[in-house]
């Protein structure tokens, strides 16, 4: 029997206050908010992100901002305005950019969003000391399409990430039919 009690649930794609209230009732401790700088569904502009993140703070729910800004300056402005507890960045940043973020936002947790087509272990090792968490997305979003990989296809990459000794959250394409298999095969943090 699989024990899922140690798996932490993080729900992403939150776009409304009602969803935050439901999450609080269900005792979900972490919610992800996708910036409209990302491709894909369920995104919000910075003003809405700020409001939703403030509401999360009232419920003591960790707010994770998923962003795709490619310049450090744009990302700093977005973090300063929306004030998330955690940021999930795309692959665009150098080690020095993360050092700048750590210097400016001392309490900010930094996550890296990874997908099966953008996996570079050498890069991930080089920034690992500055990163708090990895978010591995089985989905790849383009303007008009979502391509989903199975966790089994990505198992080797996920296991390589686990060797970096950071929490790993797996998302995208997870549903009631495959959740147990994903957990059993990859043993993620959440």
Question: Which ranges hold each PLM region?
Answer:
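Aromatic/hydrophobic pocket-lining residues that form π-stacking "cages" and hydrophobic walls in ligand
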Residues: 52
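A short, Lys/Arg-enriched amphipathic alpha-helix followed by its capping loop at the start of a domain
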Residues: 22-28
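Short N-terminal binding/cap micro-motifs at the start of the first secondary-structure element
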Residues: 17-21
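C-terminal active-site rim and adjoining tail of enzyme catalytic domains
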Residues: 12, 167-190
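Conserved anion-binding
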Residues: 34-39, 55-178
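N-terminal amphipathic alpha-helix/helix-capping segment at the start of soluble metabolic enzymes
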Residues: 1-14
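Conserved, mostly hydrophobic/aromatic
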Residues: 23, 87, 182
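Glycine-rich, proline-tolerant flexible connector loops at the mouths of alpha/beta enzymes
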Residues: 30-48
